[in-house]
Each structure stands twice: as structure tokens, then as C-alpha cells.
Amino acid sequence: MKKILALMLALLLCISLAACGNNPNTDDPSATTSATTAANAGDDGTRAPIVNPSDPLGPSRPTLDVEGHSDENNDKKCDDCGISVVTTFDFYAINDLHGKFVETSNTAGVEGLTTYMQQSAAADDNPIFLASGDMWQGGPHSNLTKGLIVTDWMNYMGFASMTLGNHEFDWGEEYIEDNAELANFPLLAINIYDKYTNKQVEYCESSVLIECRGLQVGIIGAIGDCYSSISADKVEDVYFKTGSQLTALVKAESEALRAAGADLIVYSLHDGGTGGSVGSYYDNVLSNGYVDIVFEGHSHHSYVLRDAKGVYHLQNSGDNGGISHAELEYNFANGKYSVTEAEHVRSSVYSEYEDAPIVAQLLEKYKDVVGKADEVLGVNSMVKDADRLRDIIAELYFDAGVERWGAEYDIVLGGGYMSAREPGYLHAGTIVYGDLQQIFPFDNELVLCSIQGRDLVNKFLETTNSSYFIFCGSYGNSIRNDIDPDGTYYIITDTYSSNYAPNRLTEIARYDANVFARDLLAEYIKAGNFDTSTGELTSIEQILYLGSNMPANAQTLDAYRVRGEIVEIYNTTYGNMILSDGQGNLLTVYGVSAADGTRYDRMSDKPQVGDIVTLEAPIKRYVNANTGEDIIELFQSVLIELEK
């Protein structure tokens, strides 16, 4: 029955979304067409608003009778004929999806999100789906297809538009162009300009005007002041107009959309704040009638707020942590509107919905490309946080550089700026390539660089930037306290750090193409370096003895395998529990996951009180400095065996 219901909803959505935005393709995810573009460029380099070509008519969404009515007393009824003169628009906005396409033990995918959006839209008068940037880069399946699998999904869903974010540039402009060609919706960014022509770049539009049952909604898209966050070599041919220049562009575009018949103006901005108030990223003058509602992104904060002029601003957390939803009631007789609902819908809500088949269909379509995500690399015996992983990568940078160039150059260090993404740690258990690609999605190649001594000290050896990780070899350690400020030294870093102008690095040579931090880490895991378990059982009594002789809050480097009976589960989300050996010895377990990283609460067959389990984890001695509580525990364990 569930499958029949899902098919009926999909059919209804195919009909209904034609009223607002592009027609979703529910039959063949590979059958897509290019977005409509406008060639009539203005003198300032911008282009006129494009009009969505979708048929606004549909059997379930008849065109509204919007002409010839008045409602001077604003009672939502025509003063003459008495019919209702209000309709509602429901906006569903995604920002910073970061390619989280397939559900994992740590993040939601679009399987349940698809069903949630379809069911919600089927019940709405005028549903509109839009995206506010950073949609592609981050998840393994999206990264391996360079965003195409996400764009294909957005085609299927009938998105009205997608604003470009800074991470859309991580692979270079050519891949933005590839996605623009595939998309049935326009990529928006009113303020991205070509450095050589001083005109708006060809692969995105300023706005789109969509028709909804006789009414028209304009959507303006812009990227925020985040140019410096992009690797310099990826944006060397473009620049962003920000500040007062961006305000002027948006005002002019709003006026053009109003002149073209727009009843409402939506601003989709890849920039945002923390939610306390609207910050400097947004010019409040735009709330003086130029925009009616703002959907934001980039900062990965969840908020719904109203600015001083009463305009709503919404953002969801990012990494598929949720979506923004706003319902706006519009009176087409007098042009007045009000936001009747504005909310952040968490992924915990839509993850419970039935999986939509489109995800499996698209994975099948791209199977020759995305298969690498499931490549098994080996076993990680204990959870490793992002800092530990980045320390290891810095050492791997150094080792790779010394092996390649060490005979010719005295290499001081390896490392540089390293950003780790969600979930921010590597789970214990079996590791696949996709696990690494999710944490380290960036395609920055290794380079040998020269650097002046003073910059070596300030930018690397003694930097205060906590995102810089370095490893010095024996030579580097021998000279690090005696650096000549005017001397020339050599380091191994990656192209993100080498292209960052303030580092003042000179590239000498580049390592093999398409070898990135995650690839070095993958080979390291394949060599068995993360499998530190002996596989032998250690008694609970011995675990308690070993832990009692450890310093406060210390953790072993090795993982230990323990068997015992569960006598208590005191946290049903993470699986915190107490084990007994039947001889009076009790052991605390802080966290249990499956071998594939699935968290305790998401396991299909959870260990319960009375079960016998074999777990593997490092030993940790946890001492609370405030209370003096002293606990010996297995820290973030992996379930090896379960006996009911």
C-alpha cells in the first residue's frame, strides 16, 4: 500500500508542480533539457529576467481569476463579487546541501527528503522549490559526478532555481557550465562578473520569473562576499560585486521584475548570519519594497527572523540538516501579503519518510562513476577525530614530498590549511572511500613550494590559525628554532594553501594529478595502519586494571576487544551501556556503533539488556575535573558480535 501511495503522490506532484517552477521528470531521470536563457544583455553587463517556460496550467491547479477584483477593507474577499481573493505560496528552500545525497550513519540523504517535499507540495496551493547555494560539493556521490547527480535530482523535483555558492567553484567554472547545461532550472548569481568583459558570466542568470496559476513570482539570486574562501586558481577569471554594488544590482533587478509583472520578489542569497539579527551581509534598504522574503545560506546556521522592515529571513543548518519552509499568503486584489508560517524542518523529521525510488534510479544511472564511493579500504579500530586525521595527512604530505623531491630539496615540513567537513570524525569499523571523501571532499593537489623564512615561521611554524596542520621531519625539527628570516626554505603543501596569496608561496613542482589528501589517507588505511586491534579478547577485569594505571583523560592508541553481558543501557541514542563479566566487574561503554559506522539508535538489530556482546574500542580514563568522577570506559566502540 505504501508503494501505491508513493506512486500516486509522485503522479500528483508531476501534475501540480507544473504550476510553479519546472516540470519534474518522474519517469526518466536521464531525460533533461537545458535551462532557458535570455541573450538580451543590458549596458551594465546584466541580462534581463528570464521567464520560466513551464505550462502554468494543470488539472489540479486551475488558473486563478485574478483580474478585476478589489478588496479595500482587506477582508480577503472581493468587494464586488465576494469570492476569496487570497492564495498561498509555499516555499521550500535548501541551502548548503553539500552533496549529502545518500543517507549515512551520520547524515541524512535525499531519500526521505524527496518524499517529504512531494507530499508537502501536493497539499499546497502554489509550491516553489529553490536552492541557495553550495548544493554539489561535499558528498561522495555528488563529488564523483561533479554535482550532476544532485542537479538531476533537482530536475526531477522541479526546482525553480539554484543560487550559486562559493563551493560551486571548487572544481572550476567548467563544471558549473556542465551542470548549467543539464539543469532544467536557471543557476542564479546576479553579481558574478567576467574580469575581462566586465559583464555577467554566461553560465548564470540574474533572476527568474515563474508563473503560478496566473500570478508571477520573481526570484533574484546572489552570491555573498565569500570570494576569498575559494581557491584562487578557480576564480582567477571572475569577480563578485558585493556591498553597495550588489545592492544596486538587486534593486534594479527587482524593478525590472516588477515591471515584467512580478507579484512577489524572493531573494535567494548565498550569505547569512548566526540568526540573532540581520548582519552586514544584507542591506536593509532592500526590505523597502525591493524583496518580500529572503532565503539565505553559507553560514550553516538555522534561523527564522524578521528584519527591521518586517521582511523574513530564513536559513537551515546545512549538510542536509534540514530545509526552510515559509508559507506566504497573497491578496491578489490589493497586492498585500503576509508570512503565515516560517519554520526550519529538521532532517530528523523527513528521514522518517519512505525512501523515494528516484535516488536508487540515479545511483543506477551514474553507477560507473559513483562505484568508487563503496570501495572498501580497510578497518579503523577506533574513532579518529578530524584533528588526528589532519595530523596524519600532514605527515603523509611530508612523506610523499620527501619520496618525490627529497634528494634535491631539504624539505622542512608538510601540511597547510586543512578543512574537515561533517561528520568531523572517522568512525570505527570498516572504512570505504566515500567515508574519506565526505570528511575531506576538496580536490587540492600536492605541491612543492619555496617560502621565505619569515613567512615559514609566521604562516606555518608559529601560525595561530587552528586549521593549519603541519609535520616536520628531522631536518625541519633541527632548524625550526633557527630560521633565517631572509632565507629560502621548501615545504610540501596543497594548492589551496599555495594559491592563498598571503602565504607568499612559490610553486616549484606539482605531485601526480588527481591525488588529494583523502587518496593519501586511503592508501595509508589500505596498508593496515588504522587496524590496531589484536583480535584477542581482553577480560573486563584486565581492562579496568589497565585503565586505572592511565593518566586522567588519557586514551590508548590500541583498540581492545571485550565480551560481556549488557546490564544497563543509559543512553539509547548512542548506546552508552554497562557490561558485566558475571564476576562482579562492571565496565562502562561510551557509545556503540555497527561495523559500518551506523549509530546505535539506527541499528536494525540493537543490542539490548541481557544480550551478550563483543565490542572493540580504545580504553579511556575519564576524569571530571569539577566533580572528581573517575570512570574507566570503552570509548566509542564497534559491535563485533551479538548474542541474543
Predicted regions and their residues:
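Sec-dependent signal peptide recognition
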Residues: 2-10
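Bacterial signal peptide processing site
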Residues: 21-23
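Catalytic centers of hydrolytic enzymes
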Residues: 88, 100, 122, 238, ...
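Intrinsically disordered, low-complexity serine/threonine-rich repeat tracts
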Residues: 27-64, 70
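Acidic, glycine-anchored loop motifs typical of Ca2+
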Residues: 76
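Acidic, metal/ion-coordinating pockets
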Residues: 85-351
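C-terminal motif of bacterial Sec signal peptides marking the signal peptidase cleavage site
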Residues: 16-19
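OB-fold single-stranded nucleic acid-binding module
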Residues: 535-644
